[in-house]
Amino acid sequence: MMNDNNERKPLRTIKGRVISNKMQKTVTVLVERQIKHALYGKYIKRSTKIHAHDADDLCNEGDVVLMTEVAPISKTKNWRVVEIVARSD
């Protein structure tokens, strides 16, 4: 059944640290998360590298950025940098 009012799901946003800005209009962002081990209950760090679109080339290595999910921009990019939360030192 279709919903009459055009409600959209809220876009996913994630925070990560820029580890590379060598590409044009693209940054590589490291996103870390913690998962709980199924048997032992210990929390383990896991990380994912994501390519994100940075239209104005404002991000530098070490910056903490907020990204949102968008329609695919290229083969590997479907995230866009929304905001630079913290600049690198």
From Swiss-Prot:
- Name any Gene Ontology BP term: translation
What would be an example GO MF term here? rRNA binding
A GO CC term? cytosolic small ribosomal subunit
The alphabetical list of record keywords is: Ribonucleoprotein, Ribosomal protein, RNA-binding, rRNA-binding
Q: How does it assemble?
A: Part of the 30S ribosomal subunit.
Similarity comment: family membership: Belongs to the universal ribosomal protein uS17 family.
* Free-text function comment from the UniProt entry: One of the primary rRNA binding proteins, it binds specifically to the 5'-end of 16S ribosomal RNA.
Q: Could you identify this protein by its name?
A: Small ribosomal subunit protein uS17
Q: Which gene encodes it?
A: rpsQ
